[in-house]
């Protein structure tokens, strides 16, 4: 892509797409796990078919959305605050915001941006931002943009509220939507009732919940982030590189545990954290199969819980890689039914959300089926996130149908990114 080229996207007026038939009204309960991450997750999906042009893309997307919203009717409502002071959904049925748009080029002009996913300023143009929205309550749970390109392909850009869907639930919603577009029944109908995860009465906090601890920045990291431009990079970890990491770790561990320990250590080194800086690692563990009983198939809410390590930067950077990998392993092993229900009850008592000061938050989308959504134009040629929700986040991403590789996306201040890149050469 030539550096001088600028993607220009011309949007039409947004419309509201409501469920195709009457749906239940009233307040829809969101669990305490749904309260944790009040952010909009932005993703894009590029479709191109040799046998079907993009002329009807907007109408197909709109019609199938209207039909699938009958099953996922809370997504057509609006977020509100419940009488208990928590985020809930007012099931108004008013609909999802959908925007039709045209790009000034074929997709080849932005090939680098969409394949390396490290140019959020370009990708942001493919997802609609609700103008004037001051907070999460003023943004509909789902926002859709369909952008047609001159090459005959189109991009489906989505903004989805994390209070409504975690990654697994979002992929199941998208899959249901794509099945509807192809005239198929839903292979996994949604299970909408989130009261399964109500807090206990009375609440029982049985574990320390340091994931919510607010740490002090004594290393000047906040100033570094404000003084320097954030640079985004993606790093591909293929099977051979991942195997080398496991050998370096000198301990029995999963790919996730090894890679997480390695990246945590590398980021601490790149940011030049003081040895006595208290730091935190947060990552989401899927609790669907760990709850007792397990959550039902198709559970359409947040089934993830945050687990954590809290230590000092020196403990991570001055010890061998095996030490940080073992810390990650211990955090994974903490997550069971008792820990997750204790976290639910902790929020009920404190209303605390995880603090991100001196924290790295790792989110793995590596096992999410980004590439399998077929709305009638075949599977996406390429898909992925639009930027990162917070500067403290590292994303693990799938590499299309290659299940043995992981693409790592992060942003760091320019000087720190140079150091980080050097550490990635293993």
UniProtKB/Swiss-Prot annotation:
Spell out the coiled coil positions from the record: none
Is the keyword Signal in the record? no
Query: A GO biological process this protein is involved in?
Result: cell wall organization
Give one GO term, molecular function aspect: caffeoyl-CoA: alcohol caffeoyl transferase activity
Can you tell me which residues form the catalytic site?
162, 374
Primary role: Involved in the synthesis of alkyl hydroxycinnamates in root waxes. Functions as a fatty alcohol:hydroxy cinnamoyl-CoA acyltransferase with apparent preference for caffeoyl-CoA.
Its family?
Answer: Belongs to the plant acyltransferase family.
Q: What is the protein's name according to its record?
A: Fatty alcohol:caffeoyl-CoA acyltransferase
């Amino acid at each position: 892509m030539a550096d001088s080229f600028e993607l220009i996207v011309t949007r039409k007026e947004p419309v509201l797409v409501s469920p195709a038939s009457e749906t239940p009204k009233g307040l829809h309960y969101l669990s305490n796990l749904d309260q944790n991450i009040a952010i909009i997750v932005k993703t894009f999906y590029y479709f191109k078919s040799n046998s079907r042009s993009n002329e009807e893309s907007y109408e197909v997307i709109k019609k199938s959305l209207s039909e699938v919203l009958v099953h996922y009717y809370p997504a057509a409502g609006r977020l509100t605050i419940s009488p208990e002071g928590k985020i809930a959904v007012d099931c108004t049925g008013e609909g999802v915001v959908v925007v039709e748009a045209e790009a000034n080029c074929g997709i080849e002009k932005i090939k680098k941006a969409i394949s390396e996913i490290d140019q959020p300023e370009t990708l942001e143009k493919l997802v609609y931002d609700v103008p004037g929205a001051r907070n999460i309550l003023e943004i509909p749970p789902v926002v859709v943009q369909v952008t047609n390109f001159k090459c005959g392909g189109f991009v489906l850009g989505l903004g989805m509220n994390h209070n409504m869907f975690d990654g697994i639930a979002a992929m199941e919603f998208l899959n249901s939507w794509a099945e509807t577009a192809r005239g198929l029944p839903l292979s996994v109908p949604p299970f909408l009732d989130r009261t399964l995860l109500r807090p206990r009465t009375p609440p029982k906090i049985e574990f320390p919940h340091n994931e919510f601890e607010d740490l002090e920045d004594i290393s000047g990291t906040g100033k570094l982030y404000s003084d320097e431009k954030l640079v985004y990079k993606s790093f591909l970890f293929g099977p051979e590189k991942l195997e080398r990491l496991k050998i370096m770790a000198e301990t029995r561990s999963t790919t996730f545990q090894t890679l997480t320990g390695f990246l945590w250590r590398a980021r601490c080194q790149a940011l030049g954290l003081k040895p006595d800086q208290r730091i935190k690692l947060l990552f989401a563990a899927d609790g669907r199969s760990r709850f007792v009983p397990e959550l039902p198939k198709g559970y359409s809410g947040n089934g993830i819980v945050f687990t954590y390590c809290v230590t000092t930067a020196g403990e991570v950077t001055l010890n061998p890689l095996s030490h940080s990998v073992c810390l990650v392993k211990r955090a994974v092993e903490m997550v069971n039914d008792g820990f997750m229900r204790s976290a639910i009850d902790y929020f009920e008592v404190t209303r605390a959300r995880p603090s991100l000061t001196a924290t790295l938050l790792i989110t793995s989308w590596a096992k999410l089926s980004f590439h399998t959504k077929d709305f009638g134009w075949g599977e996406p040629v390429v898909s992925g996130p639009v930027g990162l929700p917070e500067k403290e986040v590292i994303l693990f991403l799938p590499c299309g149908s290659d299940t043995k590789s992981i693409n790592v996306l992060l942003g760091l201040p320019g000087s720190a990114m140079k150091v980080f890149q050097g550490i990635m050469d293993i």
